[in-house]
């Protein structure tokens, strides 16, 4: 009888913990910085701030820098705890080379109203794409996703014509990442926002570049490798950073790899 009582208590505890995590899951997935920062305040005076409207009416802050001539335009999607202002140095380096930028703050981020969800972020990405596509031809648009933003980038590039795709620390699915911590929960059944990039990336036909650190403690390198395997684009590349973690790839040569990719140099190199 004692063992039965213990089992019942443990089962009830498990159910309670599962319920708590289910109802609070989005607060554990999204960490929005809610402060609105203009490009000038962030130190990127070259950029203009524009307002986009998503299909559901949400208004979104975005940064825009026109490219020099036919140079690429980066359509940039940051991670779940990111903000455009954290990538100013990266943007500045790209802009110096004449590359353009359309960077969007998701709903709930950067002073925007609303709350982030998978469907919401996808709608935000489509609004950013519509802005870019109205000004630049599809082959000039390069989609760059970082961490959670890779799922947004994959979904967009799988559905819209783009010139190139850059995925920095991509993951196969949100459940796969979360299961490393919550291994004891049926996350594929519980998670509202699945972000199944593994099911979408095969639909991308544009050239793909994957950047991933072998020491990444947030999204294991094995997931980046798996995403590379699932990519059916005939022109695909993966650049591995031996000592790279999750957010330090710029200091390890990521922008150099991106520059070569944008210039088409990697297209002429043998695949790994």
PLM regions and their residue ranges:
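An N-terminal hydrophobic leader/cap segment in hydrolases
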Residues: 9-53, 272
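Membrane-embedded segments
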Residues: 55-135, 146, 151, 157
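Catalytic histidine neighborhood in serine/cysteine hydrolases
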Residues: 225-247
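Post-His helix in hydrolase/transferase enzymes
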Residues: 249-263
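Primarily recognizes the serine-hydrolase "nucleophile elbow" in alpha/beta-hydrolase
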Residues: 130-184
């Amino acid at each position: 009888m004692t063992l039965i009582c213990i089992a019942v208590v443990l089962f009830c505890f498990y159910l309670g913990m599962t319920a708590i995590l289910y109802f609070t899951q989005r607060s554990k997935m999204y960490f929005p910085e809610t402060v609105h920062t203009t490009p000038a305040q962030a130190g990127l005076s070259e950029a203009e701030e524009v307002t986009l409207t998503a299909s559901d009416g949400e208004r979104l802050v975005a940064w825009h820098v026109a490219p020099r001539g036919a140079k690429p335009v980066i359509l940039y999607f940051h991670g779940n705890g990111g903000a455009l202002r954290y990538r100013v140095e990266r943007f500045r380096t790209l802009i110096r080379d004449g590359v353009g930028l359309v960077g969007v703050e998701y709903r709930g981020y950067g002073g925007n109203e609303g709350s982030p969800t998978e469907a919401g972020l996808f709608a935000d990405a489509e609004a950013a794409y519509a802005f870019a596509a109205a000004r630049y031809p599809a082959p000039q648009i390069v989609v760059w996703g970082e961490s959670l933003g890779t799922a947004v980038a994959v979904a967009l590039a799988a559905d819209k014509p783009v010139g190139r795709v850059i995925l920095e620390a991509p993951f196969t699915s949100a459940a796969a990442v979360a299961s490393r911590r919550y291994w004891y929960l049926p996350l594929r059944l519980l998670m509202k926002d699945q972000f199944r990039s593994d099911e979408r990336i095969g639909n991308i036909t544009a050239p793909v570049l994957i950047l991933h650190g072998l020491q990444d403690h947030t999204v294991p390198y094995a997931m980046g490798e798996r995403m590379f395997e699932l990519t059916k684009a005939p022109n695909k590349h993966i650049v591995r950073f031996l000592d790279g973690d999750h957010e330090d790839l710029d200091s390890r040569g990521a922008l150099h790899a991106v520059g070569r990719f944008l210039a088409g140099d990697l297209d002429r190199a043998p695949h790994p």
